[in-house]
Design a protein with these regions (language model features):
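Concave beta-strand-loop units of leucine-rich repeat
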Residues: 1-3, 9-46, 50-69, 76-89
């Protein structure tokens, strides 16, 4: 598994599409993604616990973990996702 414990901010897109070797435990201190967060078909089952801002879109698959989809919808409703939620397939 990829481990990036010091990563707190991403100044652009965070694309982990199809990458099963990265999950929410890989980026435990991630707070901000200024661009798109593309996490469809990845190892994510939850949003990173400290993530509080996504400046772009969240792109996910309807076949991804239902709990993750619920968390994303809640974050969107709370205004944490500026670009909205988009399904890729």
């Amino acid at each position: 598994m990829i481990q990036l414990p010091s990563l707190t901010h991403i100044g652009g897109d965070f694309n982990v599409y199809g990458n099963l070797s990265i999950d929410e435990g890989s980026v435990p201190n991630l707070e901000v993604i200024k661009g798109d967060f593309i996490l469809a078909h990845s190892g994510f089952r939850n949003l990173p616990s400290k993530l509080n801002f996504i400046g772009g879109r969240v792109i996910i698959s309807p076949s991804d973990d239902p709990g993750l989809i619920k968390q994303i919808r809640e974050a969107d409703a709370a205004g944490k996702i500026l670009g909205g939620v988009h399904f890729c397939d």
